[in-house]
Amino acid sequence: MTTNRSAPSATIVPILVYEDVGKALEFLSRAFGFKERLRAEWGGAISHAQMDIGSGSIMMGKQGGPFRVSSGDTVSQYAHVHVDDVDRHFERAKAEGATILKTPEDMPFGVRQYTAKDIGGHWWTFSQNIRDVDPVEWGARVADR
C-alpha cells in the first residue's frame, strides 16, 4: 500500500459533517481529546479537516449539497472510541460542554462506557476495558473464521 501524508492510515475513517468545521475542530479537541492532523481552507473557511485519537482517525467536512448536519434526536450511526480512563474522559467532556446522553456505566461485556453528543449532533460512545469477558457470557457468539 502506498503511504500518503494527506490521508489517515486507519483502515476505516468516518467522515462527519458539521456546519462549522473550525468550531468542530476546537470542540472535539477540548471535549474529547482529539488531535488535529490537518485542515484545508477554501473560500475563507475550513471546509475539510482530519483528526486523530489513539490509532483512529476521522475526517470532517462542511455541510453542503447532499451532506447535512443531523437534525432531531435520532441517529443512524455513532462512533465508539476506546480511551484509557473513561471517568476522567467523561468529566472533561462534561466540563467542555458536551451533551451527556448516558453517564458512565459498567457493561456486561467488560467495558465501562458513556455516550455524549457533540456540537454537530453526532453521538459518541467512549469506553474503557475493565475486565476480560468471554463473549458467550453476555449472549454473543464468536464467528468461525
Give the positions of each predicted feature:
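C-terminal catalytic core of tyrosine-transesterase DNA break-rejoin enzymes
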Residues: 120
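Vicinal oxygen chelate
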Residues: 1-15, 25-117, 126-145
